[in-house]
Amino acid sequence: MKLRDSLAVNKSIRLQAEAETWQDAVKIGVDLLVAADVVEPRYYQAILDGVEQFGPYFVIAPGLTMPHGRPEEGVKKTGFSLVTLKKPLEFNHDDNDPVDILITMAAVDANTHQEVGIMQIVNLFEDEENFDRLRACRTEQEVLDLIDRTNAAA
């Protein structure tokens, strides 16, 4: 499933969210996927367990994190949620803190995870100005329009 379609169909966008800790921020993204029946509630704990084991492996660029677990950790279908934070948070990453954009991903298999999920997110942020454009979005439609413009330019 495409990033844009998943966000639109699942109504899984939350802008200017408030969170006290990185764990709270991750939970916001996972809860959107739980509400859309994309993942089971246990997916949240699986992500936390992954961080405990491997560190903040999903902080992939300055200000951007892509929380995700493994397919067998509660994924029902492939989907994404997108959360922007009102106040950036520390994820304990050496290079890319603080974070204020979270794209939570659930993939049914490793191939989908790598080829579909990561590539769509890389495409969105290939234009670094899209970080600030996304931070400026205040409605779901503005986010979807930004993704549409990026896809049209690709």
Curated annotation (Swiss-Prot):
Ranges where the PTS EIIA type-2 domain occurs: 6-150
GO annotations of cellular component type: cytoplasm
InterPro entries referenced in this protein's UniProt entry, alphabetically: Ascorbate-PTS_EIIA_comp (IPR051351), PTrfase/Anion_transptr (IPR016152), PTS_EIIA_type-2_dom (IPR002178)
Residues annotated with Phosphohistidine modification: H68
Positions of the catalytic residues: H68 (tele-phosphohistidine intermediate)
Molecular functions (GO terms): kinase activity
Gene3D superfamilies attached to this UniProt entry: Mannitol-specific EII, Chain A
Domain notes: The PTS EIIA type-2 domain is phosphorylated by phospho-HPr on a histidyl residue. Then, it transfers the phosphoryl group to the PTS EIIB type-2 domain.
Function noted in UniProt: The phosphoenolpyruvate-dependent sugar phosphotransferase system (sugar PTS), a major carbohydrate active transport system, catalyzes the phosphorylation of incoming sugar substrates concomitantly with their translocation across the cell membrane. The enzyme II UlaABC PTS system is involved in ascorbate transport.
Protein name: Ascorbate-specific PTS system EIIA component
Species in which this protein is naturally found: Shigella dysenteriae serotype 1 (strain Sd197)
